[in-house]
């Protein structure tokens, strides 16, 4: 679990967000280390708990709240031969040019080469004449 700060209006348990990097005001903020220092650009986070601590912030309409976040499970298309529940693999994105499936082919929050654990097989999906498995994965750190 990671402690960070989010805008007061976004501080709701269950909310997911992608961290894209620091804003200009963050570079001189005294809270930057706790706010953005624990987050990795391009990763998806899910708020699991909102604490009753707030701080002023010029970026987030006046206030930020202290929250606890985790990286959630993410759905991604995978070659069927690698889709084994419980296995850990190095993520390799499939080739699929269907715009409707873009978020499943290269979901935000995951990068090519990430070590992931396959949690669940969700569905069979066809794309470009090929059959893939839609799986739910969790990124392994370290």
Curated annotation (Swiss-Prot):
| Family annotation (InterPro entries) | UPF0179
Domain of life, per lineage: Archaea
UniProt-listed PANTHER family: UPF0179 PROTEIN MJ1627
- Please report which protein family the annotation says this sequence is part of: Belongs to the UPF0179 family.
Protein name (Swiss-Prot/TrEMBL):
UPF0179 protein PH1477
Q: Which organism is it from?
A: Pyrococcus horikoshii (strain ATCC 700860 / DSM 12428 / JCM 9974 / NBRC 100139 / OT-3)
């Amino acid at each position: 679990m990671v402690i960070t700060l989010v805008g007061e209006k976004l501080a709701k348990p269950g909310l997911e967000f992608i961290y894209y990097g620091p804003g200009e005001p963050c570079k001189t903020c005294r809270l930057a280390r706790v706010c953005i220092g624990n987050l990795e650009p391009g990763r998806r986070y899910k708020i699991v708990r909102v604490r009753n601590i707030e701080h002023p912030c010029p970026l987030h309409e006046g206030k930020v709240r202290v929250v606890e976040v985790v990286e959630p499970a993410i759905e991604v298309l995978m070659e069927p031969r690698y889709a084994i529940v419980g296995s850990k693999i190095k993520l390799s994105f499939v080739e699929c040019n269907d715009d409707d499936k873009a978020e499943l082919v290269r979901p935000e929050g995951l990068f090519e080469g990430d070590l992931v654990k396959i949690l669940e097989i969700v569905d069979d999906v066809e794309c470009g004449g090929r059959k893939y498995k839609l799986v739910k994965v969790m990124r392994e750190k370290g």
